């Protein structure tokens, strides 16, 4: 299985989801001055921001991470979290990233996710990597 990369704000909702998921993952730092470089294909797990609009939906730290061509070249899919209170914009960071990076939007979950979300993501990630060659 290939990598998961995620961002979680100080609310830690996405971090708690990733802990429960129990798969190896790298966290994009909260501090924008800290940078990471990912050297293998990965799926990005990202929360949506902005109170329901597309503007500001993708966290700044994630934008900075993806603006590094090395990192952007290795993204293979995106999973988004959000709040259903945002209506149609629920999980919209996933849509924005999928469109801009030309990768599939694989799944979305609310806040910390449910056990069903954990099970679906675990299964979906495994199936995704089996269908996609690691070198792709």
UniProtKB/Swiss-Prot annotation:
GO terms under biological process: protein modification process
Q: At the top level of its lineage, which domain of life is listed? A: Bacteria
Entry-linked Pfam families: Flavodoxin_NdrI
| InterPro entries in UniProt | Flavoprotein-like_sf, RNR_Ib_NrdI_bac, RNR_NrdI
A Gene Ontology molecular-function term? FMN binding
The entry assigns this protein to a family as follows: Belongs to the NrdI family.
What does the record give as the function of this protein? Probably involved in ribonucleotide reductase function.
Q: What is this protein called?
A: Protein NrdI
Question: What organism is the protein native to?
Answer: Salmonella newport (strain SL254)
